[in-house]
Amino acid sequence: MKRLKKWVLPYYPYQGYQLPLYWYPSSDPNCLGHDLNILDYGVQHITNILQKRYCSLFSVFTICFPRVFPVDTTQDNTYFCNAMELFLRGIAFTHPSYIWVRERNDSIHQHYHLALWVDGSVCKSFIAIGEALECRWCNTLGVYTPGLVEYRSAEYNKIELYRDRSDLETIGQAVYKYSYLSKLYTKETDINTNVKHWHHNR
């Protein structure tokens, strides 16, 4: 019987947290570790949210293009930015804050990860919000393909952050989850893109 190749995921120490290093076996040092600009901003935002809001709901969404989409988006975030503008306008009552990152695996099109915080006193679930995001995304693309926005996993993995009540373990879970956005190995380091690869609203 052929033995499976086995390797251990290393960890990255960051401000007392043990975060996954998120790497594929590679000789390219640019594919290892985290973008500290993205990581630092998000972790500071989690701290700010805990100070400013009694309860905040947090999770991460993945937004993809259809497998067959006949437009070259290598140098373009227009579709995503237009969809986000409409989406955020529709959920303004939840007082959203967000950070998005642009990434690419083996697809000809990029995908996006969206870290979203909403007011937990007016929103208890990400299902309706995820459905709204998928609707805006599909309308912007001019296609309807269910599953382009992974919102059910966002609902399943949501984290509730409470001011003065969230323990270090809960905060650590939020930092761990957010750190996925800062991984380097899918940040298009091998493609000459001149477009913004991450953005936040505050």
Predicted regions and their residues:
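Catalytic "initiation/cleavage/transfer" segments centered on a nucleophilic residue
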Residues: 1-57, 77, 120-202
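Generic alpha-helix detector with strongest preference for long hydrophobic helices that associate
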Residues: 27, 65, 95-96, 111, ...
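Amphipathic, alpha-helical segments enriched in basic
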Residues: 36-38, 89, 93, 112
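Signature for HUH/AEP ssDNA processing cores
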Residues: 45-104
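Eukaryotic short linear interaction motifs
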Residues: 69-71, 107, 122-124
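Histidine-centered divalent-metal-coordination microenvironment in nucleic-acid enzymes
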Residues: 98-121
